[in-house]
Amino acid sequence: AIHDSIIPGAVLCVVENGDISYLQAYGNRAVVPAQETMTTNTIFDFFSVSKPTGAVSAALLLCAEGKLNVNDYVSQYIPQYHSDVQIRHLMTHYSGLPAYMTAARLDSIYLARGTKMSRPAFTIDTIARCKRPSAVGEKYRYSCLNFISLQKVVEAIIGEDINTYMRNKLYRPLGNNTMGWLPADSLLDRIAPTECIDEVCIIGDVHDPLARIMMTGVSGNAGVFATA
């Protein structure tokens, strides 16, 4: 992929029985506006890997503590939510929800209504009331909205934002002090850019527009940053 210029670089990490047996950086982490060599401590936007490493992991931690059950209805935690959707439907993409909602359309509606709700609150309220293309359990449809919903379930239980919870509950105890949403400015020189348009690069901000604009960077569908 690097040779064919599909990606500028990568980091390969092999873990066996809990120990790193191989760790190597290849190529470059940036080529615009200047070339930067890839390093093993480069931090990446995890894109949709944020779903299992973020929202799902948080939900499973709560399940292990007896605070959440996959058969619970989402409406127990988000009262206005579709009444027939269970936690397991969110986790397995069988909620019937649309695949996505564009940030541009959501934000235009948000601004037009002049609501006092925050953008994240408006987003989950819109998801909770939206028209679904299929019935719950009827059809598998990969949906970012499932995991924004799961995030909000988690936050309703823990009483804090998922970023703070996961940093303290999982990432830092595992020794990964750089993992989480909204990476610190002090880490910017280690973060690989995700996209560059006219030599202006997205670095340290989640690439997904719905997560970046409507969820302000902390979202169940995207936004986790970490090393390999």
Predicted regions and their residues:
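Short, conserved catalytic-motif segment at the N-terminal edge
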Residues: 1-44, 67-71, 125-129, 202, ...
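Hydrophobic pocket-lining residues that define ligand/cofactor binding sites across diverse proteins
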Residues: 2, 62, 154-157
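Short active-site loop at a secondary-structure junction
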Residues: 4-11, 33-90, 134-145, 219-222
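Short, solvent-exposed turn/loop segments enriched in Gly/Ser/Thr/Pro and often Arg
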Residues: 16, 74, 78, 182-188
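Residue-level detector of alpha-helical secondary structure
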Residues: 16-17, 58-61, 169
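Amphipathic, positively biased hydrophobic alpha-helical segments used for protein targeting
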Residues: 29, 38, 65-68, 107, ...
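Short, surface-exposed loop or secondary-structure junction motifs
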Residues: 85-228
